[in-house]
């Protein structure tokens, strides 16, 4: 979406992608959810003492 609309602000891109996400079925969302879980577990293994500090 960012490549198709290079002048669009990030906030607008996020809103549109959020709207698209809400339209997906659970089956369509599942690969993304599973990948997020895999990456989270990998990060926890590689950085066990990591603490989020904004």
Curated annotation (Swiss-Prot):
TM region(s), chain numbering: none
Name of protein: SRY-related protein AMA2
InterPro entries recorded: HMG_box_dom (IPR009071), HMG_box_dom_sf (IPR036910), SRY-related_HMG-box_TF-like (IPR050140)
Xref: PROSITE patterns: HMG_BOX_2
Domain of life: Eukaryota
Organism classification: Eukaryota, Metazoa, Chordata, Craniata, Vertebrata
Compartments where found: Nucleus
Record-level GO cellular component terms: nucleus
Matches recorded under SMART domains: HMG
Gene Ontology molecular functions: DNA-binding transcription activator activity, RNA polymerase II-specific; RNA polymerase II cis-regulatory region sequence-specific DNA binding
DNA-binding region(s), residue ranges: 1-51
Main location: nucleus
Keyword list, A-Z: DNA-binding, Nucleus
A Pfam family recorded for this sequence: HMG_box
A GO BP entry: brain development
